[in-house]
Amino acid sequence: MKALRNYLDKIKPNFEEGGKFHAFRSVFDGFETFLFVPNATSKSGTHIHDSIDSKRIMSMVVIALVPALLFGMYNVGYQHFHATGAAGGFWEMFIYGFLAVLPKIIVSYVVGLGIEFVVAQWKKEEIQEGFLVSGILIPMIVPVDCPLWILAVATAFSVIFAKEVFGGTGMNVFNVALITRAFLFFAYPTKMSGDAVWVSGDSIFGLGQSVDGLTVATPLGAAATSGAVPEFSWDMVTGLIPGSIGETSVIAIALGAILLLWTGIASWKTMFSVFVGLSLIHI
């Protein structure tokens, strides 16, 4: 890390006022503060110096999402192999899911961060770190069959109109990931609901098999259609059920929640209020 620090210090003058790459100062600052804690200090007032800044907080949230993301990748492969009847072991299922989910993560970050870089350059401000979390949340809350171009349009819409128009990270009144989901649901309802969007029916690099017209209902979808609550299954807890990429596993999500509580990033009061509010709605 010392060698990397020395290299950044060496090229930093090129991005400062008068340097040949001054126009890209915001981009450089964004990468530098992502890798290292800024050494800036306040000139007045009483402040507490803490090594945990907003980028570190966002990074910890991303780490907390990893269990649900990894399980979601496996579940994408599991649902495909299970629905198509194709033979495959754990690694075949995981690799299939990884290849199906990775393009969505790339599109989300490229579009969202691209817009934030452009806005930061235009406003001559530092790169804001809020999209570190939104960029991973967006692909986790959409069906695996959501087309990439639709995901790109929805991501661009939410970053611009739900975040940047309000001033950026910390000043937006809406959650970017949830606005993306809402935009997709109302603008492209056939790609976000029904029984044909939860399981991938395509073969990826020779893994799995292509099947036309593959339909699989989620437990809640089946309950809404039949009017009967599905019989309890531990698959609903472990997450081996159809659904959006990162939403199915209670265990994986709970692991992330425990990490956030243990590190002090999240409050149990906030989490508890979600369940209380949901319960009151159904009274």
Describe each PLM feature range.
Residues 170-254:
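Long hydrophobic alpha-helical segments that form multi-pass transmembrane helix bundles
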Residues 42-48, 112-123, 160-170, 255-263:
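C-terminal ends of transmembrane helices
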Residues 95-108, 145-153, 241-249:
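Structural signature of hydrophobic alpha-helical transmembrane segments
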Residues 116, 134-144, 254-260:
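Generic transmembrane alpha-helix motif of multi-pass integral membrane proteins
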Residues 281-283:
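Conserved small/polar residues in nucleotide/adenosyl-binding loops
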